C-alpha cells in the first residue's frame, strides 16, 4: 500500500505482489523514506495479504495486516483440540497431527521486525529409548527453524517438551508451522488436550503488525 499526493488529496494505491514472497516492484529509500522503486511520489505505508476475494484478515491464526508506521505487537496462536493422535512412518518431521490447520500465518511487509513462536506439547512412544520431539517451521512443514528445542528419550512415559523460534523472517506471507518429529520406531502418541481441561498443547507467538 502506497500513499501519494493527488492534487492535494492523500490517496492510497495498492500493488499486487508477484507471489506470496516476491514483490512485483521493489521498495527503495528516498531521503531515508521507503518508497516505490522508480517512483518517489509513492510512499510505502504497509502491506496486507488477501485471505479471500476482496478481503483480508486479522485474527489469532492469521495476522495479515502489516503497518510500516506505528506498529504494535500482537499475538498469534493455534491449538489442536484432538484428544491425542499417533505418528509412525518414514517421514521424520511433519506438521502436527498431519493437519494443515496447525500453523499461524503473518504478513511481513519489511524484513526488520522480530517474530517469536513457541510450541509446547506432551507425547510418548511405545518403543524403548527412542527420541521424539517438536519444532517450529518457517515456511516449511519438514525443516525445524527453532533455535531452542527439546525432546524425550523414553518409553511409555509421557514427557513435555517445547521449541522456541526468534528471528526476523523475510518479507512476505510467513507460515509459522507447529512441527513434530518421530524416531521411526514404535508408535508416537502426541496429545492435544487429552480429553481434559488441565492440558492443552499448541503454538503461540507474537509479531509486529
Identify what each model region corresponds to:
Residues 2-4, 114-118, 175-179:
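Residues within well-ordered beta-strands of beta-sheet-rich folds
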Residues 118-171, 178-209:
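Terminal beta-strand-rich extracellular "head" domains
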Residues 108-116, 171:
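Extended extracellular/luminal ectodomain segments enriched in beta-structured repeat modules
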Residues 25-27, 94-97, 154-156, 177:
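A short linear-motif detector with a strong N-terminal bias
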Residues 1-92, 175:
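Beta-strand-rich solenoidal segments
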Residues 93-108, 158-163:
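Short beta-strands within extracellular/lumenal beta-sheet-rich domains
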Residues 79-88, 94-99, 136-140, 147:
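Substrate-binding/charge-relay-adjacent region of secreted/lumenal peptidase catalytic domains
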